[in-house]
């Protein structure tokens, strides 16, 4: 679930150099990166003073950084559907995490982003979370890499319970598993291999990273880079949600998402912030 202040970040990277494109007049290779629930807590956006995102920062320096971002809907499925189909939620009718967009009548005549590239002579690839869940529209991609949930699955919970005893997806903390077993590591490695093949046909590759979506799990090494006692907490205004419409407060009251008061009263607020930053 995507919080109201979160956004789906898409970074288009032209893998071929501009000079090469200008001389040879060849179509550029395109890499699309979707990062689930990433807000402005990255170095180049300055959302949190302790955020460390050297790779995103280098990418921003090489291209154009759009810093005034808006999500089409504050939840996964409608936001991703809007981006991949080019149709806003008010036109598609997709407002929640179901149904799957390729089953929606209003989208039957829409051409998805990968199909558009395919029609222009591109070979299309994907790995990780691009659409909501692990499903994909039939025929969207020529080659499909690792899918969400196919690699490391962590069953041991670090936080025994949250609000109302609900567990859901809300858990956080460092994990001692080997870093190369984490899903995002697997997806990135697969994408790098595809890019390095350098085929004659131009490619469009969409890679979706699951973190920092809940649960906020990261390798222990990364988690410990910013000790909890040094964490700077964000400013939270009293009554900040008082002017929100009912649907927004209903989403934030879902049992899987504990209220802010739980983090404060349980003394886990700094640890949760630490975990999010580690996932970034």
Language model features with spans:
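N-terminal secretory signal peptides that target proteins for export/translocation
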Residues: 1-4
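Bacterial N-terminal signal peptides
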Residues: 7-18
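Formylglycine-dependent sulfatase
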Residues: 22-280
């Amino acid at each position: 679930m995507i919080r109201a202040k979160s956004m789906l970040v898409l970074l288009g990277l032209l893998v071929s150099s501009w000079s090469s494109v200008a001389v040879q007049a060849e179509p550029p290779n395109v890499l699309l990166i979707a990062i689930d629930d990433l807000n402005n807590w990255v170095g180049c956006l300055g959302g949190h003073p302790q955020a460390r995102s050297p790779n995103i920062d280098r990418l921003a320096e090489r291209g154009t950084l759009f810093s005034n971002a808006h999500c089409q809907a504050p939840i996964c499925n409608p936001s991703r559907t809007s981006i991949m189909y080019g149709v806003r939620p008010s036109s598609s009718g997709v407002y929640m995490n179901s149904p799957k967009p390729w089953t929606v009548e209003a989208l039957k005549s829409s051409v998805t982003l990968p199909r558009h590239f395919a029609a222009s002579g591109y070979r299309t690839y994907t790995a990780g979370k691009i659409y909501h869940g692990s499903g994909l529209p039939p025929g969207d991609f020529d080659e499909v890499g690792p899918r969400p949930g196919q690699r490391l699955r962590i069953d041991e919970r670090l936080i025994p319970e949250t609000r109302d005893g609900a567990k859901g997806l809300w858990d956080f903390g460092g994990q001692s598993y080997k870093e190369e077993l984490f899903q995002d590591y697997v997806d990135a490695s697969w994408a790098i291999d595809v890019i390095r093949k350098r085929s004659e046909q131009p490619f469009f590759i969409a890679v979706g990273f699951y973190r920092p979506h809940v649960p906020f799990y990261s390798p222990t090494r990364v988690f410990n880079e910013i000790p909890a006692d040094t964490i700077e907490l964000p400013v939270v205004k009293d009554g900040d949600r008082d002017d929100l419409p009912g649907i927004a407060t209903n989403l934030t009251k879902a049992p899987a998402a504990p209220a802010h008061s739980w983090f404060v009263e349980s003394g886990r607020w700094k640890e949760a912030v630490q975990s999010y930053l580690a996932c970034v």
